[in-house]
Amino acid sequence: MAATKRKRRGGLAVQAKKLKRDAKDGKLPAKANDVSEEAAEEEKDRIPGPVCKGKWKNKERILIFSSRGINFRTRHLMQDLRMLMPHSKADTKMDRKDKLFVINEVCEMKNCNKCIYFEAKKKQDLYMWLSNSPHGPSAKFLVQNIHTLAELKMTGNCLKGSRPLLSFDPAFDELPHYALLKELLIQIFSTPRYHPKSQPFVDHVFTFTILDNRIWFRNFQIIEEDAALVEIGPRFVLNLIKIFQGSFGGPTLYENPHYQSPNMHRRVIRSITAAKYREKQQVKDVQKLRKKEPKTILPHDPTADVFVTPAEEKPVEIQWVKPEPKVDLKARKKRIYKRQRKMKQKMSSGNAK
């Protein structure tokens, strides 16, 4: 029995050696050839996955969230930004009582190094913080003229998760505070290459334009045929307030001299309307005083009647006869109509007999 086992083992070893020799010589057995052909056919039918020739190195993660008290338009804008930025993360609303320094701890827990924070005040004013957590810098903006994707309904469209191009106004390179904001916007809004949630396509462009001391944001689709631009949305305008050295605080690097707070703006509007009302009341009071004043009687000017010619005096006629009464044409027509009607009735009754 032992001898037979040894022989079998030896036979198996010999067969394995033969297979190895055939593989080296390029001659596979018939079964191996069939397996390779089946694998080749399966590979032909298989749909190739997305092409990724590189490694994800830029690990930028953006935390996008807000404070309590925002309205529906701000919430929709926040959702649109999350949709356009696949490298973003969401979090629950922050309480108003918490200080802004707590956001740095939230970013650390969420493993994010950039933050977009929407701060609502008085249920009508919206502020946006762009911050590099935890070391800074950070910038505070007043958000104006918000138009969301659902509100605009533009004809443009882009692939969800695709990477955008960033287009900046040449004015960003002229002043140092705009150059700092440009770098901050590049790091926040640019989707990292080879990000797992991103698509390997570039089919839309974010434009940042400086006009009237404000930054105007637009999102356009790039059409493949003629490279034309069609707007997608959303839209908003950023009015810079301050740039801080730290994240959500610290020494002030720049303060916008052209900025006017919403409270001040509303106060100016109220003062203008109040001034108009006061002016109307003053005009009414002056008119009342003029009416109450006694009228000054001017002395008669004899030269005023120089060119007045007196009318000829007509003789007085006394009418002794009573004037004839005026003929009432309407009553006369009615009488004639009644007479004609009676005649017709008589004629019709005579014919019937």
Curated annotation (Swiss-Prot):
The modification N6-acetyllysine is found at K276. The modification Phosphoserine is found at S261. One of its GO terms (biological process) is ribosomal large subunit assembly. There is a cross-link at K160, K314, K322 (Glycyl lysine isopeptide (Lys-Gly) (interchain with G-Cter in SUMO2)). Keywords: Acetylation, Isopeptide bond, Nucleus, Phosphoprotein, Ribosome biogenesis, Ubl conjugation. One of its GO terms (molecular function) is rRNA binding. GO terms for cellular component: chromosome; nucleolus. PROSITE patterns: BRIX. It is found in: Nucleus, Nucleolus. Its main location: nucleus. The keyword Ubl conjugation applies. Residues 1-10 have a biased composition (Basic residues). Residues 60-249 form the Brix domain. Residues 1-46 are annotated as: Disordered. Belongs to the BRX1 family. Required for biogenesis of the 60S ribosomal subunit. This is Ribosome biogenesis protein BRX1 homolog. It comes from Bos taurus (Bovine).
